[in-house]
Curated annotation (Swiss-Prot):
Organism (species): Alteromonas mediterranea (strain DSM 17117 / CIP 110805 / LMG 28347 / Deep ecotype)
UniProt xrefs under SUPFAM superfamilies: JAB1/MPN domain, RuvA domain 2-like
Stated name of the protein: UPF0758 protein MADE_1000235
Entry binding sites for Zn(2+): H173, H175, D186
UniProt motif (JAMM motif) ranges: 173-186
Organism phylogeny: Bacteria, Pseudomonadati, Pseudomonadota, Gammaproteobacteria, Alteromonadales
Similarity comment text for this entry: Belongs to the UPF0758 family.
PANTHER family linked: DNA REPAIR PROTEIN RADC, UPF0758 PROTEIN YEES-RELATED
């Protein structure tokens, strides 16, 4: 049944305008982004198919083009719309970090890093370069690894820190396994990097490990001593 014949109070777009996006279900939000359905299916029906195929809202926005296309009638244009929306979300978080004191906004930092790294299929090691006010200068992916490791070289980190003229840094890497618990190797590496950065008087404020369901802060765990 076409959404046009639904009562106005039940149409996703009208509900959003009247009650706000936070009051829509995942399927209704997807339907608004889709705009319209495909032959024989309205936008809400297609949205449910996407959720069933890709598992959840996160699966929809992080799916590959081929995965997205498994739902009949959904082409590259719709995929591009969802990717653009997800990128806007990530950039908005980055802008927020650039305006605020990163170290005093651990939850915002976690959300930003989750958006950056949670769905990467290979391990990545990155630095948040901070100025003297602990505001974000840049996010730098320093090393790309395999599904369970990434080789990290402190000398290369020092070189990039000096190029960016960072006053402090935050370390971050993801665990593609989905488990964010820091390993003994993670703790040893953090100690090595702290020692290397001390040689140029740049403090390491935190080290985040991004997993599937959580992001762990070394500082909150007392692991930076």
């Amino acid at each position: 049944m076409s959404i046009k014949v639904w009562p106005k109070s039940e149409r996703p777009r009208e509900k959003l305008l009247q009650y706000g996006a936070e009051n829509l279900s995942d399927a209704e939000l997807i339907a608004v982004l889709l705009g319209k359905g495909v032959k024989g299916k309205n936008a809400v029906s297609v949205a449910h198919e996407l959720l069933n195929e890709l598992g959840c809202l996160r699966g929809v926005v992080t799916a590959t083009k081929d995965e997205f296309a498994k739902v009949t009638g959904i082409g590259p244009c719709k995929y591009a719309q969802f990717q653009a929306g997800f990128e806007i979300f990530k950039r908005n978080l980055e802008i927020k970090l650039q305006r605020e004191d990163v170290f005093n906004n651990v939850d915002d930092t976690k959300r930003y890093l989750q958006a950056k790294l949670r769905d990467c299929q290979r391990e990545k090691f990155a630095l948040l370069m901070l100025d003297s006010q602990h505001q974000l200068i840049a996010f730098r992916t320093m090393f790309n690894g395999t599904i369970n490791s990434a080789a990290v070289y402190p000398r290369e980190l020092i070189k990039q820190v000096m190029i960016d003229n960072a006053a402090a840094i935050i370390l971050v890497h993801n665990h593609p396994s989905g488990v964010a618990e820091p390993s003994h190797a993670d703790i040893r590496l953090t100690t090595e990097i702290k020692s290397a950065m001390a040689s140029i008087d740049v403090p390491v404020l935190d080290h985040f490990v991004v997993g599937d369901k959580e992001t762990i802060s070394f500082a909150q765990r007392g692991l930076l001593t």
